[in-house]
Amino acid sequence: AFAGILADADITAALAACKAEGTFKHGEFFTKIGLKGKSAADIKKVFGIIDQDKSDFVEEDELKLFLQNFSAGARALTDAETATFLKAGDSDGDGKIGVDEFAAMVKG
């Protein structure tokens, strides 16, 4: 799904680094997969993949399964990791992350 945007080796390394519960840190993950240095258009494409219900927002249930977008066998995020991730990205407090909020979080 991320072909042409992200390198498989970077994704594999990033997933390995947060394999244990409680170790997911979104900033480190975005850096490791190489997303931080990508164009706004590429970041928007990645958002579109993560936004599985195509609502133009990434909601809590989609965040919980965030890692599985990168590898079907990846773990779900814990409730605490999901809450931290949502809080970091939800700058307007509406309980979900829009594309601009996602881009700001990636670049952050």
Curated annotation (Swiss-Prot):
Domain of life: Eukaryota
List of residues binding Ca(2+) 1: 51, 53, 55, 57, 59, 62
InterPro entries, alphabetized: EF-hand-dom_pair, EF_Hand_1_Ca_BS, EF_hand_dom, Parvalbumin
GO cellular component: cytoplasm
Domain EF-hand: 38-73, 77-108
Pfam families per record: EF-hand_7
MF terms (GO), sorted A to Z: calcium ion binding
Function summary: In muscle, parvalbumin is thought to be involved in relaxation after contraction. It binds two calcium ions.
UniProt cross-references to PANTHER family, sorted A to Z: PARVALBUMIN, PARVALBUMIN ALPHA
Note: Is regarded as an important allergen.
Protein name in the entry: Parvalbumin beta 1
Source species: Merluccius gayi (South Pacific hake)
Biological classification of the source: Eukaryota, Metazoa, Chordata, Craniata, Vertebrata
